[in-house]
Amino acid sequence: MPDPMRSYLDFEKPVAELDSKIDELRALAASGSDISEEISSIEEKAAQALKDLYANLTPWQKTQVARHPQRPHFSDFVKGLITEFTPLAGDRKFGEDEALIGGFGRFRGESICVIGQEKGATTESRLKHNFGMARPEGYRKAVRLMDMADRFDIPVLSLVDSAGAYPGIGAEERGQAEAIARSTDACLSLGVANIAVIIGEGGSGGAIAIATANRVLMLEHAIYSVISPEAASSILWRDSSKAQEAATNMKITAQDLLRFGVIDAILKEPAGGAHRDPAAVIALTGDAIAGALNDLRNLDRDSLRQQRRQKFIDIGRKLG
């Protein structure tokens, strides 16, 4: 059987079958049979099949990969990249929102403010973090942290992974749209460097509220869009089953967005996606963040602010 801890997507069935065969042969080898050459041969086939498959993913398949339950989340990146991380809670107006986590720590020896959505990895944690869908108090907490970072001249890192801001009645009553707008404005107004990395789903205003940054990086199989493919197909065709078609037409992949100038760089994932080798992806992401911060190091506060604002004005003019 394939690794019981590994979750395969529907389109990965050929790879799952090869992995299953490898496990069967390994079980035979453990009983004394000398079949190492056969195992090696099938392992090579499985690796090549995975490489070929992921080299030609459709936008809808990338959407599935971006949502993979074993994909590294905000907390994994923080554990792998940030030392002495101290989370801060509450918006000082209503309460705490655990869908959006933020705090201060050290990145490669230097102080940094980190904010981002956490989806959770288990049923209990997903409920605790509301599947990464932040409420108004989450975005107001982000504004509070960005204000602190700006005051103490500490760069800001945003790790984006959310299907979107929470659309519940309570969230709307507490000013969800206003909170998103103020968070977006806080990003644009920072006098310190800020880097955003789309690590999974970058959904709508819930994503851009913390992603209007000097540099926007995106993992190879992440997605970034104004609306989910399912919702778009329901609106455009009154049929959610057309999500695959919507995903293609919406241009939500890193490759499309780099071509349009919406993002600045694509971070390579291993064959099979980030969930196949989280440690490697996290390390590569750390190097990219360090490089981006270094590029911005010599810019003064006004230049950082102007570069960021002009970046998004140019996107609007180009794509508007």
Curated annotation (Swiss-Prot):
The reaction(s) this protein catalyses: N(6)-carboxybiotinyl-L-lysyl-[protein] + acetyl-CoA = N(6)-biotinyl-L-lysyl-[protein] + malonyl-CoA
A GO CC term attached to the entry: acetyl-CoA carboxylase complex
Residue ranges annotated for the CoA carboxyltransferase C-terminal domain, each copy included: 41-295
Pathway(s) of this molecule: Lipid metabolism; malonyl-CoA biosynthesis; malonyl-CoA from acetyl-CoA: step 1/1
Keywords: ATP-binding, Cytoplasm, Fatty acid biosynthesis, Fatty acid metabolism, Lipid biosynthesis, Lipid metabolism, Nucleotide-binding, Transferase
SUPFAM superfamilies: ClpP/crotonase (SSF52096)
Gene3D superfamilies listed in its UniProt record: 2-enoyl-CoA Hydratase, Chain A, domain 1 (3.90.226.10)
GO biological process, one term: malonyl-CoA biosynthetic process
Keyword ATP-binding among record annotations: yes
Transmembrane as UniProt keyword: no
SS bonds (residue pairs): none
GO molecular function: acetyl-CoA carboxylase activity; ATP binding; carboxyl- or carbamoyltransferase activity
Subcellular location: Cytoplasm
Enzyme Commission code: 2.1.3.15
Subunit structure comment from the entry: Acetyl-CoA carboxylase is a heterohexamer composed of biotin carboxyl carrier protein (AccB), biotin carboxylase (AccC) and two subunits each of ACCase subunit alpha (AccA) and ACCase subunit beta (AccD).
Family affiliation: Belongs to the AccA family.
PANTHER family linked to this entry: ACETYL-COENZYME A CARBOXYLASE CARBOXYL TRANSFERASE SUBUNIT ALPHA, ACETYL-COENZYME A CARBOXYLASE CARBOXYL TRANSFERASE SUBUNIT ALPHA, CHLOROPLASTIC
Function noted in UniProt: Component of the acetyl coenzyme A carboxylase (ACC) complex. First, biotin carboxylase catalyzes the carboxylation of biotin on its carrier protein (BCCP) and then the CO(2) group is transferred by the carboxyltransferase to acetyl-CoA to form malonyl-CoA.
Name assigned to this protein: Acetyl-coenzyme A carboxylase carboxyl transferase subunit alpha
Organism annotation: Nitrobacter winogradskyi (strain ATCC 25391 / DSM 10237 / CIP 104748 / NCIMB 11846 / Nb-255)
Name of the coding gene: accA
